[in-house]
Amino acid sequence: MVEPANTVGLPVNPTPLLKDELDIVIPTIRNLDFLEMWRPFLQPYHLIIVQDGDPSKKIHVPEGYDYELYNRNDINRILGPKASCISFKDSACRCFGYMVSKKKYIFTIDDDCFVAKDPSGKAVNALEQHIKNLLCPSSPFFFNTLYDPYREGADFVRGYPFSLREGVSTAVSHGLWLNIPDYDAPTQLVKPKERNTRYVDAVMTIPKGTLFPMCGMNLAFDRDLIGPAMYFGLMGDGQPIGRYDDMWAGWCIKVICDHLSLGVKTGLPYIYHSKASNPFVNLKKEYKGIFWQEEIIPFFQNAKLSKEAVTVQQCYIELSKMVKEKLSSLDPYFDKLADAMVTWIEAWDELNPPAASGKA
């Protein structure tokens, strides 16, 4: 049995890393009491809360946190007609927070994620580990069998090319979860009582050319390097699919990171995932995606971006054209999704003008 950490009595971190360069984005439909547990690690940072569902509902945020809160009315007001690209009644709405942030780094976490304990019983400061991951290079071109060579106590093994040891910039840090695993509905149904109790003390770079199923509940990224590609798609209300928002974004960002020679890391940090979602509800959301993914994944595996695509925006627009051309025959939904991908980039550039942000 794995339990969350007890952080009562832990002091608020007096020297938080990147305090003025990082926003924490939280999508929610409920009060954010879970932030009490995270206070020692997260209180010094600015929060962007994206309220899903009924905009008239009052969301309670624990005292002492600095935050902005956006509901659907705010999204419609800020984006106008382009608000159609932001999902409703789905945690995919979190990507609006990425768009309105003005910071270099983003950490996003779900409201059912608590502080985990490492094997020694110490509370895990997930954000601090994400920051370490992002500030260290990645090694996507050659696999290091000691995993992350830049971690303390590790290095490049014998036979690792010296020409590749400088590594590349890390764009994404993908964390994991103890307790409730991030399973699809069919797996949930056959393993309803399974809990993840394995804490693997490792961080690794996902190799170039390899896709992965990105989970958005414990994720950090360099907004300047990959932000415009962190679009969580059209999910939830009025859409034929759900629970593929983070994975769609993950497939897109991995193709783009590979093209632009950027790194994606996975492994530490862990959070404690407290609440199992309903597998029958999940199956209804995932049903089409379970079949579609058998064609979507080969599509991304074979996606090749042109040499002319040198910015994230250019890469993403090229990818949207490929989605329209190659996946629309699968379902008309992908035609709509491809259009939404373009709308997302237009909205991003409106709120983040390249000249002002330095992201040409």
Curated annotation (Swiss-Prot):
Cofactors named for this entry: Mn(2+); Mg(2+)
Keyword Repeat recorded: no
Source species: Arabidopsis thaliana
Pfam families recorded: RGP (PF03214)
Signal sequence, renumbered to the chain: none
Phylogenetic classification of the source organism: Eukaryota, Viridiplantae, Streptophyta, Embryophyta, Tracheophyta
Residue positions with a glycan: R158
Reaction(s) catalysed (UniProt annotation): UDP-beta-L-arabinofuranose = UDP-beta-L-arabinopyranose
EC number: 5.4.99.30
Keyword Cytoplasm among UniProt keywords: yes
Family that this chain belongs to: Belongs to the RGP family.
The protein, known as: UDP-arabinopyranose mutase 2
Gene ablation phenotype (knockout): No visible phenotype under normal growth condition, but significant reduction in total cell wall arabinose. Rgp1 and rgp2 double mutant is male gametophyte lethal, with an arrest in pollen mitosis. RNAi-mediated knockdown of both RGP1 and RGP2 causes severe developmental defects and strong reduction in total cell wall arabinose.
